[in-house]
Amino acid sequence: LPFEDLGFAKVDHHRDLRTGFPEVIYAPGKSPDQLIQITRSMVESSSRVLITRADPEAYAWVKEALPEAHYNELARTIVLKRGKEVPLVRGVLIVAAGTADLPVAEEAAVTAELMGNEVERLWDVGIAGVHRLLEHLSLLQKAKVVVAVAGMEGALPSLVGGLVSAPVIAVPTSVGYGASFQGLAALLAMLNSCSPGIAVVNIDNGFGAG
């Protein structure tokens, strides 16, 4: 299968054909030249390019070389798209327990949208104020898939899983105090959920959930 060997990176141009989504660029740890060369290579072969965990400095590097780049500061993502817009598929709902979870939740949203999905967002509906979530029960129950993002005790996906028939993708975040262990407590809570139909991704992995 073809790839482009840049020396410091082997860019997989056929991943979109195999998996339905092109290779994604993880920005941290890359020099300006490396990031720009990889991005240029991807743009030449793909109609959509996603760069994750990009800080404003990384965006400035890419924007100077590729002016069509778009930055989502909350999600820390850079997106480049070309060609015709395709109709979006409805049914993805992303819920976040707290405002501090939004960078991870928005990363999931950007990823899902780039994959051709119309995404609805429901923010700050953690279980400490469960009435905030129940106010949107009809929105939850019409979703085809729900991504539930939470730190602290990580209970939101279990609650959502008990309210909907759709699959739930649980995303633990590193938000929380001491004994949250940078998201480990939320991860273990989600893995041990008694609600059926829940899949769990890694801590802070909004991209993996989207």
Language-model regions, residue ranges each:
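Anion-binding alpha/beta catalytic cores of soluble intermediary-metabolism enzymes, centered on
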Residues: 50-87
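Glycine-rich phosphate/diphosphate-binding loop of Rossmann-like nucleotide-binding domains
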Residues: 88-131
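Short glycine/serine/threonine-rich phosphate/pyrophosphate-binding segments
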Residues: 33-35, 101-106, 130-131, 150-160, ...
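Long amphipathic alpha-helical segments
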Residues: 1-60, 64-65
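Short glycine-rich or small-residue beta-strand-to-loop segments that form or flank ligand, phosphate
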Residues: 22-25, 91-97, 146-148, 199-202
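Glycine-rich phosphate-binding loop
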Residues: 135-173
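C-terminal binding/interaction regions
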Residues: 96, 141, 175, 179-210
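Glycine-rich oxoanion-binding loops at beta->alpha junctions
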Residues: 77-81, 118-142, 184-185, 204, ...
